[in-house]
UniProtKB/Swiss-Prot annotation:
Protein's name according to its UniProt entry: Probable Xaa-Pro aminopeptidase P
Listed InterPro entries: Creatin/AminoP/Spt16_N (IPR029149), Creatinase/aminopeptidase-like (IPR036005), Creatinase_N (IPR000587), Pept_M24 (IPR000994), Pept_M24B (IPR033740), Peptidase_M24_C (IPR032416), Peptidase_M24B_aminopep-P_CS (IPR001131), X-Pro_aminopeptidase_P (IPR050422)
Organism for this UniProt entry: Ajellomyces dermatitidis (strain ER-3 / ATCC MYA-2586)
SUPFAM superfamilies: Creatinase/aminopeptidase, Creatinase/prolidase N-terminal domain
GO molecular function: metal ion binding; metalloaminopeptidase activity
Source lineage: Eukaryota, Fungi, Dikarya, Ascomycota, Pezizomycotina
Its EC number(s): 3.4.11.9
Catalysed transformations (reactions): Release of any N-terminal amino acid, including proline, that is linked to proline, even from a dipeptide or tripeptide
Length: 617
């Protein structure tokens, strides 16, 4: 997608800024729940900038506009931003962060405005300090200025019905989960926990929704105290069976009343403090470090609130046995769907000489997936990319402008689905012609990185920050690298990107150790801008493993892969693999055949393709 002319939108925004005496205005990507993926009505940064990537921040002054994003989106942003915008490449030397750039624009006593519901309390404090050093000030602007510019064209807020997530898939009742949470509150001597993250609420109550594309969540807040459980959600979203399910253990309150109730809790806490300067720990409410600045302010700020890494996000990331079994099962079905798609695609392109574009491919894959048991929908927008488009890390093919799939070029497909028993995310890079030596070399180096993570053995307490280099080492030896993390946590019929764990250089990945039951993606890559891109992705489960010595008398961990989709034999250069790596590939392909071949008893085309692609190397 090319640039959108943002001139009129920026002009109107600057008029509103001037009326409110705001000199610089920040437009984050997130919604009021700090969601990575958002509903169309919350796509404010995309509306004002024209940039459609999932990560980034827009900053507008009276004379300039800047968009900051990370390495996954540099190419995309360069194509989508019009001449009104400058691109701030996150992580580049001699390139200011968006916070630093904002502070520069605020020099000389200027006011920086932001909707306080769209940034966290800790972000607000840090940003305020940075801006004050330059002589400016940060101000919360309650009325969102982008919404005013957007006007009647802004999409309506979703009001989809909520559904039960059966215990056979959840593995644990919501009553048990709330009981566990209350034990954590007791340990911290807290008055309660105010929950704002949508996937945490869905997980806690074993409910699923459809308010955000690809993410089975719903708009809600919750407050859990030692004796009460309040769910803030619009009443029309709750079918009778859900109300009956929640029973008298959960009080349902209007979604919009959360801030009023938070203020009441704040006032109650202040009265209990008997005039002391700060409330005692037993009277403080916990909020996640990802809760909004506006929610923190409603609760009375730091004197009444303790910001913590959410105990729910930790519990949710450690899957129980029912969730793990679901992840294994859905990846077998999903692997079969991908195998059928790749066999079909090769036959159409090579044998039938059919002309297909990238969207034709992604549409066909969704149709094949939809036939499988427990399928609900996709877990993200499929990346179907040919040739140079594969070098755009988060490429999105648009029906009117996408490329024809070239059988003589690399084809990268990154896709996933939501099933009732789990969430999938798989990337495969294929070639239907004769790959170049560089393409084979790059693919094989990336494969070696994937195998290094898959076969890693490490002591309890090791973080994903430490493991990240395992995947990059083979590329590093050649002076190559990739500008994205190696892996992210994956939800169980929830968000495909799930914290707090992952493999990469983000600070948070150094704070949380890999734990048995974590489900993580393993997805190294390599990208040559304008030429081709390689990425291979499997989903892995952390587990305890036996070692010969067990140094330190502590558990040692490793991984189990659950993705069951063949690698591309044509792109593997066996001479670059060790004997151990060749054995891994052969063992993996043997397992893929064992788990998925039965799906193709009556499909000779796919069965033959699968047999060929899983032959020993």
């Amino acid at each position: 997608m090319g640039p959108v002319d943002t001139s009129q939108r920026l002009a109107r925004l600057r008029e509103l800024m001037q009326e409110r005496k705001v000199d610089v205005y920040i437009v984050p990507s997130e919604d009021s729940h700090q969601s990575e993926y958002i509903a169309p009505c919350d796509g404010r940064r995309e509306f004002i900038s024209g940039f459609t990537g999932s990560a980034g921040c827009a900053i507008v002054s009276m004379s300039k506009a800047a968009l900051s994003t990370d390495g996954r989106y540099f190419n995309q942003a360069a194509k989508q931003l019009d001449n009104n915008w400058m691109l701030l490449k996150r992580g580049f030397e001699n390139m200011p962060t968006w916070q630093e750039w904002t502070a520069e624009q605020a020099e000389g006593g200027k006011v920086v405005g932001v909707d306080p519901s769209l940034i966290t309390a800790s972000e607000a404090r840090s940003l305020s300090e940075t801006i004050e050093k330059s002589g400016g000030s940060l101000q919360g602007v309650q009325e969102n200025l982008i919404d005013l510019v957007w006007g009647k064209e802004r999409p309506a807020r979703p009001s989809e019905k909520v559904a039960l997530h059966p215990i056979e898939f959840a593995g644990k009742s919501f009553e048990e989960k709330i009981s566990d949470l209350r034990k954590e509150l007791q340990k911290k001597k807290s008055a309660g926990f105010v929950i704002s993250m949508l996937d945490e609420i869905a997980w806690l109550f074993n409910l699923r929704g459809n308010d955000i594309p690809y993410n089975p969540v719903f708009f809600a807040y919750a407050i859990i105290t030692p004796t009460t459980a309040d769910l803030y959600i619009d009443d029309e979203k709750l079918p009778a069976e859900v109300k009956k399910y929640l029973g008298d253990q959960v009080s349902v309150k209007p979604y919009g009343s959360i801030f009023e109730d938070a203020k009441a809790l704040s006032q109650s806490a202040q009265k209990k403090s008997d005039g002391d300067a700060s409330t005692s720990p037993s009277e403080k409410f916990l909020i996640s470090t990802k809760a909004s600045w506006s929610l923190s302010l409603a609760l009375g700020g730091e004197k009444n609130v303790e910001e913590v890494r959410s105990p729910i996000t930790d519990a949710k990331a450690i899957k129980n046995e029912a969730e793990l079994e679901g992840m294994r099962a859905c990846h077998i079905r999903d692997g079969a769907a991908l195998t059928e798609y790749f066999a079909w695609l090769e036959n159409e392109l090579v044998n039938k000489k059919t002309v297909l574009n990238e969207v034709d491919g992604s549409d066909k894959l969704e149709q094949i997936r939809s036939k499988h048991k427990h399928f609900v929908g996709l877990s993200f927008d499929t990346i179907s990319s040919t040739g140079p488009n594969a070098a755009v890390i988060h490429y999105k093919a648009e029906r009117d402008t996408c490329s024809i799939i070239d059988p003589k070029a690399v084809y990268l497909c990154d896709s996933g689905a939501q099933y009732l028993d789990g969430t999938t995310d798989t990337t495969r890079t294929l070639h239907f012609g004769e790959p170049t030596e560089m393409e084979r070399k790059a693919y094989t180096l990336v494969l070696k990185g994937l195998i290094s993570i898959d076969t890693a053995v490490f002591p309890k307490g090791t973080t994903g920050f430490a493991l990240d280099a395992f995947a990059r080492q083979h590329l590093w030896k050649e002076g190559l690298d990739y500008l994205h993390g190696t892996g992210h946590g994956v939800g169980s019929y929830l968000n495909v990107h799930e914290g707090p764990i992952g493999l990469g250089t983000r600070v948070q990945y150094a704070e949380v150790a890999i734990t048995p039951g974590n489900v993580i993606s393993d997805e190294p890559g390599f990208y040559e801008d304008g030429v081709f891109g390689i990425r291979i992705e499997n989903i892995i489960i952390a587990k305890e493993v036996k070692t010969t010595h067990g140094f330190g008398e502590k558990p040692w961990l490793g991984f189990e892969h659950v993705t069951m989709t063949p690698l591309c034999q044509k792109l593997i250069n066996p001479s670059l693999l060790t004997d151990g790596e060749k054995k891994w590939v052969n063992d993996y392909h043997s397992k893929v055949w064992e788990k998925t071949s039965s799906y193709f008893e009556n499909d000779e085309l796919t069965r033959n393709w699968l047999k060929r692609e899983t032959q020993p190397i």
